[in-house]
């Protein structure tokens, strides 16, 4: 039961972070491109890579807080469904270049951030 509460608490934190970051990015850069979704996906992927590498290398044992971070916070912070919706909406609006750019940036940057996070931990081991 405690694990479920950790996941729920983490989900609330991650969802609030996602909303706040998305609103901040819209305020700073405008709503003509889904910068908020891109930022949360890239940052969340980087943190996920670090967390995974720490656990894989035995620096963080299967801790009860792992579900809070990896499933709760990062699961709610990053969101494939928002990425997919943003991309479809851009395409429906005829902004095909932005839709393709959104797909390319999310895929390449998120994969790179997971790898970077893992390598950052591996270089310190």
Curated annotation (Swiss-Prot):
Gene Ontology MF terms: fluoride channel activity; metal ion binding
Assigned GO CC terms: plasma membrane
Residues passing through the membrane, by range: 4-24, 35-55, 69-89, 103-123
Catalytic activity line of the entry: fluoride(in) = fluoride(out)
Keywords associated with the record: Cell inner membrane, Cell membrane, Ion channel, Ion transport, Membrane, Metal-binding, Sodium, Transmembrane, Transmembrane helix, Transport
GO biological process, one term: cellular detoxification of fluoride
UniProt membrane topology term: Multi-pass membrane protein
Protein's cellular compartments: Cell inner membrane
Key word Transmembrane helix present: yes
Entry annotated with the keyword Transmembrane: yes
Activity regulation text: Na(+) is not transported, but it plays an essential structural role and its presence is essential for fluoride channel function.
Highest taxon, organism lineage: Bacteria
Binding-site list for Na(+): 75, 78
Location (main, coarse): membrane
Annotated Pfam families: CRCB
HAMAP family: FluC (MF_00454)
Function: Fluoride-specific ion channel. Important for reducing fluoride concentration in the cell, thus reducing its toxicity.
Family: Belongs to the fluoride channel Fluc/FEX (TC 1.A.43) family.
UniProt protein name: Fluoride-specific ion channel FluC
Organism classification: Bacteria, Pseudomonadati, Pseudomonadota, Gammaproteobacteria, Aeromonadales
């Amino acid at each position: 039961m405690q694990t479920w509460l950790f996941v729920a608490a983490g989900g609330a934190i991650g969802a609030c972070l996602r909303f706040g970051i998305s609103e901040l990015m819209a305020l700073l850069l405008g709503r003509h491109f889904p910068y908020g979704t891109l930022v949360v996906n890239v940052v969340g992927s980087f943190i996920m890579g670090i967390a995974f590498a720490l656990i894989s290398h035995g620096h963080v044992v299967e801790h009860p807080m792992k579900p809070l971070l990896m499933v709760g916070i990062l699961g709610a912070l990053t969101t494939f469904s928002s990425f997919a919706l943003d991309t479809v909406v851009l395409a429906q609006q005829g902004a095909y270049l932005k839709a393709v750019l959104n797909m390319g940036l999310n895929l390449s940057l998120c994969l790179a951030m997971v790898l970077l996070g893992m390598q950052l931990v591996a270089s310190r081991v």
